[in-house]
Structure formats: structure tokens, C-alpha cells
From Swiss-Prot:
GO terms for molecular function: ATP binding; ATP hydrolysis activity; microtubule binding; microtubule motor activity; protein kinase binding. This is Kinesin-like protein KIF20A. CDD domains: KISc_KIF23_like, RBD_KIF20A. The modification Phosphothreonine is found at residue 857. Belongs to the TRAFAC class myosin-kinesin ATPase superfamily. Kinesin family. GO terms for biological process: microtubule bundle formation; microtubule-based movement; midbody abscission; mitotic cytokinesis; protein transport; regulation of cytokinesis. It comes from Homo sapiens.
């Protein structure tokens, strides 16, 4: 099998295209009788490093990305659940207003002072629930299909939450198709009579083609038939093909390249018409008018269909096999850095019916599952690509390629709504890829707004963004269709979708990536002027030709020697360019090294200064610590020396006393005592003195400990702070009672005086009745006063009972203190007896603790005479108040 891989030019349909010189990856193999041998078979790669032409972006290239919004109608079940709360409102053709409903997170955040309850978004155009599929297609996608037929690449992707109508917008139903079947119908209706009959050129990589021989063409047709038949094995198809070829050879018909394809096409039509005719009525009368296309161009249409499920790529048009596990595909890059899906099946289609059937086959292989919001939700990103090869002439020129990709993005949904592990994993991968897409769009917008500081666009963080990379970076254009669910329960997700689309609507289409490669004719012309004077005349004769004719001239018109000369000239230019680039690289390296050396020097200087400052700070800190340590040591040793001096003075004083005693003893003693006895007595006295000193030190230590215990017990004897308020209240009540007693005493004195005056009056007057009345009133007054006094005395009794309890507790503590003091005094007396040999003296008696704190009132016997007059007389005899008949002993 021999094959050649060709990369198409970009200037076959329009004279305004800048790209003229094609890029060839591999043409070393012989392609047989079908492929021309002189198609640059002597050079493997044609490249140039001449100065690229500066491309001035036109107004079309600076056009913003189209973002369309479509609102789906509410279902009857949703109306029954009261989902229609007016949260999605279309203000005009370009403005959408979102009002947060009750129970939504946005409204709760607004009540807490975070966010807004009303949001307003602007789109390219908004379509309400009443807009049908045909109107939506004519107003949005029809112009894009027209651009694709002219050679432009377009990406159309739908975005929205689950159950918002994305798949319905892309595919539609059998009766009312979406933008994908209508795009296929419009493409094939516009290209009627201009389709290339044989699939001898097949798309490869990102924007290249490969030439197929007859065997490879049969394999492609068998692959398509196996997909359309839905399980027919390739062996059966190959036997039917061999049988048809044998019959044609028996009747004398020569099997040519075209006839084999025609026969295979007829077989495929017969087979597919019997098995998949359920949608044949859809394409019988298309409702789309054809678009004008150039008449001198033929077209070859290829389709592919794959999905991205859990960040893995699967081919949805893979032929059926016995293996249950699907084969994963790899996402690679070609030599120009353009991403492509390796081993992806590209199927050649002749009409829209075949494309629609292949779409249905791919839909059967797609990943679907039931979610919280949709019973049949697609859990993967599916991408359906239509690649059109634009062929001019007899097929001996490398074709131009245009592509229309329609992507049905999986719906975003909250992960907390997914209960099972598989659905949770799917939702996480879907949200991750959509989040990466949002990051890429935000980075592209920031780079377009701030061209001085370009940020890295994270295309490689997700498979989806790597597939979209070419359309976002100038290899094509993109369009977003936002589908909105007007239900109130999905308002928060709808708001997130609207914010995402608002960022995408600010993007500007990147200018096309066109490299200003010069034409091959310019190389030959320039080289002929420099090298061969004989070719100068021919070059001057060709100067009158038009530049477009030169760019589109056939390569076969040049001889082998001229092409070799061109190769040599290109080699010299390449060497020269490499030398210049090497010099530039060396210059840049020198500059970078110098800058790095300067930075290192600055860094070293800063580090040295920092070290010096740190060293000074550490020296100061440790000097302060040393000074503090010196001061503490000097003070400590001074105290030790002072204590030692005091002890020495005490010992010297004791020694002097002992000497004085010894001298006095010697004087009082007999002079006839022997010197030896004096020495023994002196030594014994010194020993006793030392023992007494030791005991004295021990007694002092015990005295200190006992004094400390005494202080503790004194603190314990003090009333607790919790009892202070109670004692204060008792004192206040006692003072009030004493005041009342004083008042009552004054009243009694007044009453006594009145009684005395009454007695005097009784002596002079004969009105005994008046005197009796006065006595009765006085008795009543005295009774009342006695009652008040009784109440006061009862209160005082209660207070004194409480005080007695506290006094008992204090007395117990006082006895313990006395015992301890007795022990201490006994130890002191023992020490003084041993030292001075004096008789024990009793310590002065101490007054009992709190003996006079609560003086008792003297008791008095109740008088037998309880008449009011007797009580008045007793009160007159004593100035102090005596207890009445209600007095008690306490």
C-alpha cells in the first residue's frame, strides 16, 4: 500500500488569500497510476524563513464572537409544580433579565447583603419559546454554513444546564430537525452536481489529506456499509464486492477506478435502502434553498463523530465488533501544533441521508444516563464534524479544507444532586471540563484586553479545550448557543450559565493564522536573475503575468534543474537564516547573562548588608543579656557575703559572752582550783555553748514555721468575703433597732412626764374619769410599742443565733491556734532553760478570742405586776429600756 500525505493551501477559492505556497509532509512514495510522479517528488519538505508579511486584521477578523440565547418552553408537568415564577424574562431582542425567585440561593444571598436579586445580560440575539427550528436555523447557522462552503472553519457549541434543550437544538426530532440535519441538507442541496464521485482523497490529522488507492477505497466503503447495516461483518461485504467484480469481468467490462466506486456505491444504496429507510421522507423535499458556490470546484464531504466521556475520547462511528470494551482514542498534535484525534474514523458521505443515518448510529453508541433533572441525559461532550475538501481541476492540486463542527456539550448539574458513584464521577468530570473552558475564555478575553501582559491560556487542562484550541486561536471561528431552562428550581445554575456566556460574548475572533510564504515561482525567478543570465530573458518575459496566475501555476511547468537550483537557493537561505538566528540567540544569551550577573551581584550585596545588620542586632542583644547576668550574679554574691558577715558577728558576740562568763566564773571560783579543771570546765562550757547555739537555731526555725502557721490560721479566722454582706446587713439592722429603741425611750420619757403632770392634776381635780381615759390611751400606745419592740427583738434573736454559730466555728479555730501557740511556747521555754538555766515562766495570759465581741444583754425576771402603771413607773426609774413580759434570754 502506497500513500501520500498532503497539506492543503489556503488560496484556491479566493484571490485575496495570502497563503500561496503549500506545505508538504511526505511525498516520497510512488502513488501508482493515479497520482502524478512529478508532484514535487524530489523535495521532502518545502519551507522558508523569509520575512513574514504583516497581516493587518480586517473588520471581519475583529468581529466579536456570536452568542445566541434560546429559551425553551415549560412542560405541563413543570407548570403543575409551579416552576413558572417569572425568573427568566426577555426584555428585548438582545437583553435578558433574570429575577431571583424565592427559595433560590441568589435571593438568600441578596437578603444577607451579598449579590443582587436582578441581573441583566446582553446577547447577540435572543430567541423565545415560540421560535421554531427553521427560523432559528435561518437566523443563526445559515450564514455559518455559507462561510464553510467558502472555505472558513466554524465551531458551533451549545451550552446550558441539564434539560435545557441543547440536544434538541442540535439534532431536533424526525419531524422537526435541528441545526445539524438542516446544515447537512443545506450543504448537499448547495453542492448538487459538484460532489467528487470517488473518495480518493481522505482527510488526515488536522488539516491534511491522504491519497487512497483502490484497495483503501474499498475498505472505506466497507466500513461505511458495516456502520449503515448495523452489524454486517466486513467479510460478508468483501465477498459481495468480489462477486460483483467477477460478474463485471465476465460480461467484458473493464474494472476501472471510477467504475469500482460506482458499483460499490450502487451496492451500498441497495443495502441501506432496505434497512434504514425510516427517515427517507426527511430529505425528499428539503425546505432550504441552495447557496451559490463556484462552478469550477468539486467537493468531497467526510464526517466524523466522537465523544469525550470522563476525559476519555471514544469514536462513535467505530465499526461493530465482538469486543465489549470500547477503544479509547488519543489526542495528538501535528508538526504545526494543531490538535487532532488519532485513529478517528472519517466516513465519506454522498448525501444528507447517509450522514443522518450515521448520526443515528453514533447516537446509539453515545453515553446516556438518567439524572435528577433529565431521564435521558447525555453524559458526554459529543462533537460531530463535517469536513469538506475543495477540489479544483482534475484533482492534481492539493485541496483546500473547510470544517463545520457542532458540539453538544453535556449539561452542568450540581454534584450534590447525584446520588450514585458513577453519576457523581460523570458530573464532576463534566463540571471540571466546563470550568476549564470558562477559564480559557476568561484568559483569552484578558489577553485581548491587555495585550502588553499576556497570560497563559490553559488549553491543556482538559480534552475539550484542546479540541477547541484551533478555533479559538485563529484556525477558525466559534459560535455559542446558550440554552436556558426557565424553571425556578434551576435558577442558580441558569445564572451561572448566563455569567459564563457574558464572558464569551466579549471575545473577539482571532485573526487567521496565515504564514506569508512566498510562491515557488518567486524563488525560481529570483534565482534565475542571480545565477543564470540565460534565464533572465525568460524571467523578464514573464513579468507581465498576473501575480495570482503565478501563484496558481502548475509546478510541472518547471524543469528538474530549475527546481534543484531552487532547492540550493533555499538551502543557502536556510543556512543564512540559521546563522542569523544563532547570532541573535547568542546576543540574547549574553544580555540575559549580564542581567543575571547584575541581579546576582545586587542579591549578594543585599545579603551581606542584611547579615551585617543581623550581626549587630545579635551582638547588642547578647551584650544586654551579659550585663543582666553580671548584675544578678553580683547582687547574689553580695547578699551571700552580707549573710556570712552577720553570722560571723553573731558568733563573735556569743564567743565574747562566753569569755566574759568564763572570766567571771574564774574570779568567783576558788583560786586553789587546778588549772586542769578550769580547762575542762571551759571546754565543757564551749561545748554547751555550741549545743545551745544549735538548739537556738532550731528553735528559731520552728518559731518561723509556727509564726507562718499562725498567720495562716489568723487568715482563716478572718470572716470569708462571702459573709461580709451578711454581717453588713446585720449591723444595719442592729443600728436601726437601736435607733428605734432610742425613739421609744424618748416617747416613754414624754409619757412619763405626761403621767407626772396627770398625777399632779389628779391631786387638784376630781375628774377621775378623764385620768382613766388618759391611762387607757397610754396603755394602748404602750402595747403597740411593746409589739414593735417584740418584733425587733425577735429579729435580733435570729441574727444573734447566726452569730453564735459563727462564733462557735471561730472558737474551735481559736482553740487549735492556742494549742499550736502552747506547743511553740513550750519549745521556747525548753530552749531558754537549757541556755540560761532559769525557771519556767508562764506566758502572760491572753484574752479569749472574741470574748467581748457579742456582749449578752442582762436577763431580768418578768414582774408579777403587769399593770400599765407599774411599767410606766419602772421606765421612769431606769433610763435604759428593760425587757418586758415578751423578753427572752438569749
Amino acid at each position: 500500500m502506497s500513500q501520500g500525505i498532503l497539506s492543503p493551501p489556503a488560496g484556491l477559492l479566493s484571490d485575496d488569500d495570502v497563503v500561496v505556497s503549500p506545505m508538504f509532509e511526505s511525498t516520497a512514495a510512488d502513488l501508482g497510476s493515479v497520482v502524478r510522479k512529478n508532484l514535487l517528488s524530489d523535495c521532502s519538505v518545502v519551507s522558508t524563513s523569509l520575512e513574514d508579511k504583516q497581516q493587518v486584521p480586517s473588520e471581519d477578523s475583529m468581529e466579536k464572537v456570536k452568542v445566541y440565547l434560546r429559551v425553551r418552553p415549560l412542560l405541563p408537568s413543570e407548570l403543575e409544580r409551579q416552576e413558572d415564577q417569572g425568573c427568566v424574562r426577555i426584555e428585548n431582542v438582545e437583553t435578558l433579565v433574570l429575577q431571583a425567585p424565592k427559595d433560590s440561593f441568589a435571593l438568600k444571598s441578596n437578603e444577607r447583603g451579598i449579590g443582587q436579586a436582578t441581573h441583566r445580560f446582553t446577547f447577540s440575539q435572543i430567541f423565545g419559546p415560540e421560535v421554531g427550528q427553521a427560523s432559528f436555523f435561518n437566523l443563526t447557522v445559515k450564514e455559518m454554513v455559507k462561510d464553510v462552503l467558502k472555505g472558513q472553519n466554524w465551531l458551533i457549541y451549545t451550552y446550558g444546564v441539564t434539560n435545557s434543550g441543547k440536544t434538541h437544538t442540535i439534532q431536533g426530532t424526525i419531524k422537526d430537525g435541528g441545526i445539524l440535519p438542516r446544515s447537512l441538507a443545506l450543504i448537499f442541496n448547495s453542492l448538487q452536481g459538484q460532489l467528487h464521485p470517488t473518495p480518493d482523497l481522505k482527510p488526515l490529522l488536522s488539516n491534511e489529506v491522504i491519497w487512497l488507492d483502490s484497495k483503501q477505497i474499498r475498505q472505506e466503503e466497507m466500513k461505511k456499509l458495516s456502520l449503515l447495516n448495523g452489524g454486517l461483518q466486513e467479510e460478508e461485504l468483501s465477498t459481495s464486492l468480489k462477486r460483483s467484480v467477477y460478474i463485471e469481468s465476465r460480461i467484458g467490462t473493464s474494472t476501472s477506478f471510477d467504475s469500482g466506486i460506482a458499483g460499490l456505491s450502487s451496492i451500498s444504496q441497495c443495502t441501506s435502502s432496505s434497512q434504514l429507510d425510516e427517515t427517507s421522507h426527511r430529505w425528499a423535499q428539503p425546505d432550504t434553498a441552495p447557496l451559490p458556490v463556484p462552478a469550477n470546484i468539486r467537493f468531497s464531504i467526510w464526517i466524523s463523530f466522537f465523544e469525550i466521556y470522563n476525559e476519555l475520547l471514544y469514536d462513535l462511528l467505530e465499526p461493530p465488533s465482538q469486543q465489549r470494551k470500547r477503544q479509547t482514542l488519543r489526542l495528538c498534535e501535528d508538526q504545526n501544533g494543531n490538535p487532532y484525534v488519532k485513529d478517528l474514523n472519517w466516513i465519506h458521505v454522498q448525501d444528507a441521508e447517509e450522514a443522518w443515518k450515521l448520526l443515528k448510529v453514533g447516537r446509539k453508541n453515545q453515553s446516556f444516563a438518567s439524572t435528577h433533572l433529565n431521564q435521558n441525559s447525555s453524559r458526554s461532550h459529543s462533537i460531530f464534524s463535517i469536513r469538506i475538501l475543495h477540489l479544483q481541476g482534475e484533482g492534481d492540486i492539493v485541496p483546500k479544507i473547510s470544517e463545520l463542527s457542532l458540539c453538544d456539550l453535556a449539561g452542568s448539574e450540581r454534584c450534590k444532586d447525584q446520588k450514585s458513584g458513577e453519576r457523581l464521577k460523570e458530573a464532576g468530570n463534566i463540571n471540571t471540563s466546563l470550568h476549564t473552558l470558562g477559564r480559557c475564555i476568561a484568559a483569552l478575553r484578558q489577553n485581548q484586553q491587555n495585550r502588553s501582559k499576556q497570560n497563559l491560556v490553559p488549553f491543556r487542562d482538559s480534552k475539550l479545550t484542546r479540541v477547541f484550541q484551533g478555533f479559538f486561536t485563529g484556525r477558525g471561528r466559534s459560535c455559542m448557543i446558550v440554552n436556558v431552562n426557565p424553571c425556578a428550581s434551576t435558577y442558580d445554575e441558569t445564572l451561572h450559565v448566563a455569567k459564563f456566556s457574558a464572558i464569551a460574548s466579549q471575545l473577539v475572533h482571532a485573526p487567521p493564522m496565515q504564514l506569508g510564504f512566498p510562491s515557488l515561482h518567486s524563488f525560481i525567478k529570483e534565482h534565475s536573475l542571480q545565477v543564470s543570465p540565460s534565464l533572465e530573458k525568460g524571467a523578464k518575459a514573464d513579468t507581465g503575468l498576473d501575480d495570482d496566475i503565478e501563484n496558481e501555476a502548475d509546478i510541472s511547468m518547471y524543469g528538474k534543474e530549475e527546481l534543484l537550483q531552487v532547492v540550493e537557493a533555499m538551502k543557502t537561505l536556510l543556512l543564512k537564516e540559521r546563522q542569523e538566528k544563532l547570532q541573535l540567540e547568542m546576543h540574547l544569551r549574553d544580555e540575559i547573562c549580564n542581567e543575571m550577573v547584575e541581579q546576582m551581584q545586587q542579591r549578594e550585596q543585599w545579603c551581606s548588608e542584611h547579615l551585617d545588620t543581623q550581626k549587630e542586632l545579635l551582638e547588642e542583644m547578647y551584650e544586654e543579656k551579659l550585663n543582666i547576668l553580671k548584675e544578678s550574679l553580683t547582687s547574689f554574691y553580695q547578699e551571700e557575703i552580707q549573710e556570712r558577715d552577720e553570722k560571723i558577728e553573731e558568733l563573735e558576740a556569743l564567743l565574747q559572752e562566753a569569755r566574759q562568763q568564763s572570766v567571771a566564773h574564774q574570779q568567783s571560783g576558788s583560786e586553789l582550783a587546778l588549772r586542769r579543771s578550769q580547762r575542762l570546765a571551759a571546754s565543757a562550757s564551749t561545748q554547751q555553748l555550741q549545743e545551745v547555739k544549735a538548739k537556738l537555731q532550731q528553735c528559731k526555725a520552728e518559731l518561723n514555721s509556727t509564726t507562718e502557721e499562725l498567720h495562716k490560721y489568723q487568715k482563716m479566722l478572718e470572716p470569708p468575703p462571702s459573709a461580709k454582706p451578711f454581717t453588713i446587713d446585720v449591723d444595719k439592722k442592729l443600728e436601726e433597732g437601736q435607733k428605734n429603741i432610742r425613739l421609744l425611750r424618748t416617747e416613754l420619757q414624754k409619757l412619763g412626764e405626761s403621767l407626772q403632770s396627770a398625777e399632779r392634776a389628779c391631786c387638784h381635780s376630781t375628774g377621775a374619769g378623764k385620768l382613766r381615759q388618759a391611762l387607757t390611751t397610754c396603755d394602748d400606745i404602750l402595747i403597740k410599742q411593746d409589739q414593735t419592740l417584740a418584733e425587733l427583738q425577735n429579729n435580733m434573736v435570729l441574727v444573734k443565733l447566726d452569730l453564735r454559730k459563727k462564733a462557735a466555728c471561730i472558737a474551735e479555730q481559736y482553740h487549735t491556734v492556742l494549742k499550736l501557740q502552747g506547743q511553740v511556747s513550750a519549745k521556747k521555754r525548753l530552749g531558754t532553760n537549757q541556755e540560761n538555766q532559769q525557771p519556767n515562766q508562764q506566758p502572760p495570759g491572753k484574752k479569749p478570742f472574741l470574748r467581748n465581741l457579742l456582749p449578752r444583754t442582762p436577763t431580768c425576771q418578768s414582774s408579777t405586776d403587769c399593770s400599765p402603771y407599774a411599767r410606766i413607773l419602772r421606765s421612769r426609774r431606769s433610763p435604759l429600756l428593760k425587757s418586758g413580759p415578751f423578753g427572752k434570754k438569749y
